[in-house]
């Protein structure tokens, strides 16, 4: 298949691949390990963050262990480039901007806000009649910016719904109430 194939079938494939990228962000931001395994990665996928690929299950376990200590996180994927290798595999480059707030940096308080610019180099595969999923992901870290912040969001006084990184998040509750999966 040519990288520039814009047939109806390929447009559908492109949208399905983009949906997987968006579901990755939602699963990471809500710390939904099950959604990462069910909706994003093939179970035998490999992750490469430092030149030594390892199983996706280890990555998911590390996310589950690390992210509860990060009270605020937001991952946004953009600049998605999809090149089809053949009918059922594609190379996908995307950019991710991740914003994270980390616990107090000093004994005096304050938090650390970090902005990460990351590129993902993904090999997507559609196996059999199954959905598109990531078979291999390489993380390329382009930039990290850290800032100590000496203020925090004021406690809610009404009229505001605050986001959460767990099953009590308002969107998760809305989805579940409609019979949809959390992510």
Regions found by a protein language model. Give the residues of each.
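Extracellular/periplasmic carbohydrate-active domains that bind, remodel
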Residues: 4, 21, 63, 95-108, ...
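Short, surface-exposed coil-to-beta transition loops
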Residues: 75-77, 115-120
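Short beta-strand edge/turn micro-motifs at domain boundaries
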Residues: 117-159
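Acidic/histidine-enriched, glycine/proline-rich intrinsically disordered or flexible terminal extensions
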Residues: 147-183
């Amino acid at each position: 298949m040519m990288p520039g194939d814009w047939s109806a079938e390929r447009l559908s494939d492109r949208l399905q691949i983009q949906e997987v990228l968006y579901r990755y962000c939602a699963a990471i931001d809500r710390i939904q390990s099950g959604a990462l395994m069910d909706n994003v990665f093939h179970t035998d996928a490999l992750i490469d963050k430092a030149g030594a690929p390892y199983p996706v299950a280890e990555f998911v376990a590390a996310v589950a262990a690390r992210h509860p200590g990060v009270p605020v996180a937001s991952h946004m994927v953009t600049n998605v480039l999809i090149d089809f290798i053949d009918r059922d595999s594609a190379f996908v480059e995307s950019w991710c901007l991740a914003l994270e707030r980390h616990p107090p940096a000093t004994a005096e308080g304050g938090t650390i806000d970090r902005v990460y610019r990351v590129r993902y180099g993904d090999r997507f595969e559609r196996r059999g009649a199954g959905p598109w999923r990531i078979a291999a992901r390489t993380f390329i870290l382009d930039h990290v910016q850290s800032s100590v912040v000496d203020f925090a969001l004021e406690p809610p006084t009404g009229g505001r719904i605050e986001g959460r990184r767990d099953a009590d998040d308002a969107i998760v509750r809305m989805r579940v109430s409609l019979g949809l999966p959390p992510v």
